[in-house]
């Protein structure tokens, strides 16, 4: 505990005893900051552990994906805190908003997903996925891409406070990696490259085909044939949640199976549907200032999307379309917007 003027503080002893299952804190890295001590403090204060944000690890991962390199060492570099007590990310809200190394411009959705696969498929650490604003973009300042100053930054004003952000977290590859992580709790992990630094493989294994699996991020422009690749997985056949393709393992080697170019595969025998579909309208509540209010209609992996309003409007829409409501509304009248669609699995 910290000591001030000869008096000992019991702040942490008091505040952390709150019944939470898992707790973590953000420690701003600087000289003489006791990251390991803070991580141990949080980890010992909750029954399911805890830790701190590992900003230096995130920086290493961003360097890798920003410069299009999936070398395994970039995803195993925890220098200040043991990996079981870390909270990890590809990028945080600060990295995105503050213009760190031109990140908003230079990190595409594709490479964010590769980074997420490498971070999240592993055994240790807790992962956080930063959901960028809807239709993010823009440049920093007035000097063009990469400058920081008086410009709009990466925010394009397509969303307002309280609106849903990017749909990337619903992407089937992101969802499959999340499912994989949850299914592999407690199993050992191994991170390696499959032939080159643009193909990253995270294996999880416990000794049987019913338990084992691997996530492969293939950033190459062509398919990656995994035949001959050494593996710790048990003998058997494993199915990719995203595409349904399979790999076969025998005697510590992959004997057959490929991963499509520029894609992520999550092979296991614990697969489940990774399809997420949504139809939404934003903002989803509030008052109507002046004569009308603009509503943005959103859809993701949905077809036959339609809208109707209680003030008499209706029609079909595609993601990003806008409508105006309230022009005929009386004072204090509530205007309701209803959106519908057919999901990727055929559900209404």
Where are these regions (language model features)?
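Low-complexity, disordered linker/stalk regions enriched in Pro/Thr/Ser/Gly
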Residues: 274-348
């Amino acid at each position: 505990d910290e000591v001030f003027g000869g008096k000992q503080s019991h702040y942490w002893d008091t505040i952390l005893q709150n019944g939470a299952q898992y707790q973590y804190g953000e420690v701003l890295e600087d000289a003489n900051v006791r990251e390991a001590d803070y991580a141990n403090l949080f980890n010992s204060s909750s029954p399911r552990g805890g830790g701190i944000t590992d900003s230096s690890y995130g920086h290493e991962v961003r360097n890798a994906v920003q410069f299009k390199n999936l070398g395994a060492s970039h995803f195993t570099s925890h220098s200040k805190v043991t990996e079981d007590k870390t909270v990890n990310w590809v990028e945080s809200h600060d990295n995105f908003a503050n213009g760190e190394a031109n990140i908003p411009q230079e990190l595409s959705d594709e490479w964010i997903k590769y980074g997420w696969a490498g971070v999240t498929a592993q055994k240790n650490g807790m992962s956080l996925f930063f959901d960028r604003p809807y239709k993010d973009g823009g440049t920093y300042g007035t000097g063009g891409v990469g400058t920081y100053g008086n410009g709009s930054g990466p925010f394009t004003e397509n969303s307002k406070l309280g609106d849903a952000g990017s749909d990337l977290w619903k992407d089937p590859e992101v969802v499959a990696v999340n499912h994989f992580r949850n299914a592999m709790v407690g199993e050992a992990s191994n991170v390696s490259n499959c032939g080159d630094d643009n193909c990253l493989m995270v294996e999880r294994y416990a000794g049987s085909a019913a338990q084992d699996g691997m996530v492969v991020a293939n950033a190459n422009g062509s398919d990656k044939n995994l035949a001959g690749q050494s593996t710790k997985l048990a003998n058997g056949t494993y199915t990719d949640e995203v595409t349904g393709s399979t790999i076969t393992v025998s005697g510590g080697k992959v004997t057959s199976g490929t991963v499509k170019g520029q894609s992520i595969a999550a092979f296991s025998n614990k697969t489940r549907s990774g399809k997420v579909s949504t139809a939404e309208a934003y903002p989803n509540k509030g008052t109507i200032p002046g004569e009308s209010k603009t509503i943005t209609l959103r859809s993701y992996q949905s077809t036959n999307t339609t809208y109707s309003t209680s003030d008499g409007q209706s029609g079909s829409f595609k993601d990003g379309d806008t409508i105006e409501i309230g022009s005929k509304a009386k004072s204090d009248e509530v205007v309701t917007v209803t959106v519908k669609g057919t999901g990727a699995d055929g559900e209404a």
